[in-house]
Each structure stands twice: as C-alpha cells, then as structure tokens.
C-alpha cells in the first residue's frame, strides 16, 4: 500500500506547478492533501481510478483537506465533532475493514499558550 500526504499550501497554485504530473507518476493508493484553500466547486480534478473526498473550510482561501483514494471506504467522516475544527475543513477519516485513514491539517500553535518545562 502506498500513501502520500502533502501540505500543498493552495491546490490551485500547486496544480499550475505540476501537481497532476506528480500525482499520476506517484500512483499512490491514497493521496492526502492539506491546506487545499478551496471552496466547493472551485476546481475539478480529473483523477481516473480515484474516489475524491473533500472537506472545505467555511472561510474562503483557508485550510481544507482532501483524500484521493483508489479504494472506496465503508464510511467517510468529515471533521471530529467539534464546531471550531469542523468549520475549518481540517479532518477527513476514511473507514476500511482493517484500518482507518485520517488526514488532518492542524492549526498553527502561534496563538496558543505553550507549556514551558524547566531545564
């Protein structure tokens, strides 16, 4: 099984720079992307042999994830059941008979308080 995960930092720009050539050459079973920065309907990818699962952010030009899978899952879950995360399109989970595949784009921790341990 071949899995690729890539933070594309904007899929439209990435497509213009050769993403599809790499995608097809890689021939991965699962291709996960983070930070797609897309809204529904902004791009149509022709990926024969792949099922496409998208989780869009509510905010334009922000976050978003996708999984392109050769194998159709039993179930697809978008989000984790927490409104603050789910409106940002950060998580997709695919359920299969013997495993779960999760792609996650985590928030930047700059705005959070960090625990500093003594040295």
Residue ranges and their predicted role:
Residues 1-47, 57, 62:
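N-terminal, active-site-proximal structural segment of metallo-dependent hydrolase catalytic domains
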Residues 11-15, 86, 115:
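Soluble or luminal CAZymes and related metallo-dependent hydrolases
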Residues 17-20, 94, 115:
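Conserved CoA-thioester-binding segment of acyl-CoA-metabolizing enzymes
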């Amino acid at each position: 099984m071949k899995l690729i995960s890539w933070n594309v930092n904007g899929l439209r720009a990435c497509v213009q720079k050769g993403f599809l050539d790499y995608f097809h050459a890689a021939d991965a079973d699962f291709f996960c992307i983070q930070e797609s920065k897309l809204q529904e309907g902004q791009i149509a990818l022709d990926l024969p042999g792949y099922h496409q699962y998208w989780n869009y952010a509510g905010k334009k030009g922000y976050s978003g994830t996708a999984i392109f899978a050769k194998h159709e899952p039993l179930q697809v879950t978008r989000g984790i059941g927490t409104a603050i995360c789910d409106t940002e399109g950060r998580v997709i989970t695919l359920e299969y008979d013997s495993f779960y595949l999760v792609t996650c784009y985590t928030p930047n921790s700059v705005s959070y308080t960090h625990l500093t341990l003594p040295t």
